[in-house]
Amino acid sequence: MDLLTTTSTVAVACYALLSTVYKGMQAVYSLPPTVAPASEDLVGSDLWPSVDVIIPCYNEGPLTLSACLDSIANQEYAGKLRVYVVDDGSGNRDAVIPIHDNYAGDPRFDFILLPENVGKRKAQIAAIRRSSGDLVLNVDSDTTLASDVIRKLARKMQDPAIGAAMGQLTASNRSDTWLTRLIDMEYWLACNEERAAQARFGAVMCCCGPCAMYRRSSLLSLLDQYETQMFRGKPSDFGEDRHLTILMLEAGFRTEYVPDAIAVTVVPDRLGPYLRQQLRWARSTFRDTLLALRLLPGLDRYLTLDVVGQNLGPLLLALSVIAGIAQFALTATLPWPTILVIAAMTIIRCTVTACRARQARFIGFSLHTFINIFLLLPLKAYALCTLSNSDWLSRKTATLPNADKKQIIVANPIAGVGTGSSGSAEAIRRTDLPRDSSKLVNADSVCSAE
């Protein structure tokens, strides 16, 4: 039994050492830079770049979609703005048609109606190939933006070396359940520690889908690779946000984080949907980490530590916990060194975060340690063993009745015809889709916050 005790103690000690170094450097690099922020020196619509906002939606609730579109319509942006809402074969299209009609008189809005569900990636591409703006902003349909988000992201993108930039994510339903409160804190840590530290070196590893802006010229050069991503000979059907970010870095572009560009998104309020979401994210993270490894020699050494900390850390923690549980099962003695080290690290981290964020609620993030150890670590192990599985888990393909699968239906309210009006059929244009139905895939609609 001494072997189990030694294994648990050594593993947790290595985990503590690695986490202390990694989280310590992350805390330093995530501090706001001391240089003065760039001034808003662009005055007049002619100087601001044109922006195309792309919003893929699938079975989104009418109220949620309406809130999303309202936040886009009310952006305080002096440049040219176009909005492409892509209905990805929703089964509730009749319920959201009135929402489309509300924007029929706004020349900035275009609606693309896909006859069947093809996934977020192909829904995005359908709009990207139709759009023409200097910058492309991807927004999830359950997300609302602060009124200055587009302006702040566009200002960051003034540097031509930057290929992508993301805003800060918060949970719109934070107060609903204990789980949504934890997820909101998880988002804060992911944005203001992990992404902020990565952005110090211009290498945010995942620009999250709810609010991510891309340079159109950079995006177009990578579009074919993005569309045809394969894993073990199969189309990769989720994790598009992380993969597109990795492609940007591989092409030599910087990826940035803008903390004061606030996007509010809906998060899972029950454990089942949360764990299914985490399983998708874990699979996509493992897949694209393999691609990211070849980028590390050209990036700052902190990014290597970041990858090691995020992958080796959970492995050491899992080893210490498994050995500790085995020790308890076989000897009825508690692995006190492991318990005390994990408890101390949890208390220290939550206290430091609470002081830094100036929010006492982060003390309650201690509860996340139990979720991490007993739910997320086993889930990540399962994800690693099932990397080839591309099931969306919470979403099934929907085909609209009587829809022609070879067509994209584009309803353009610019012509003054709402998609729900009796004359809308006359305003519809049809374009052939690929005949190979195997190219129609499902994709994840949320980014990884980890």
Curated annotation (Swiss-Prot):
Its EC number is 2.4.1.-. InterPro entries: Chitooligosach_Synthase_NodC (IPR026463), Glyco_trans_2-like (IPR001173), Nucleotide-diphossugar_trans (IPR029044). Coiled coil: none annotated. GO terms for cellular component: plasma membrane. It is found in: Cell membrane. It is an enzyme of class 2 (transferase). GO terms for molecular function: hyaluronan synthase activity. Keywords: Cell membrane, Glycosyltransferase, Membrane, Nodulation, Transferase. It comes from the Bacteria. One of its GO terms (biological process) is extracellular matrix assembly. It is a peripheral membrane protein. The keyword Cell membrane applies. Belongs to the NodC/HAS family. Involved in the synthesis of Nod factor, a sulfated N-acyl-beta-1,4-tetrasaccharide of N-acetylglucosamine which initiates a series of events in the host plant species leading eventually to nodulation. This is N-acetylglucosaminyltransferase.
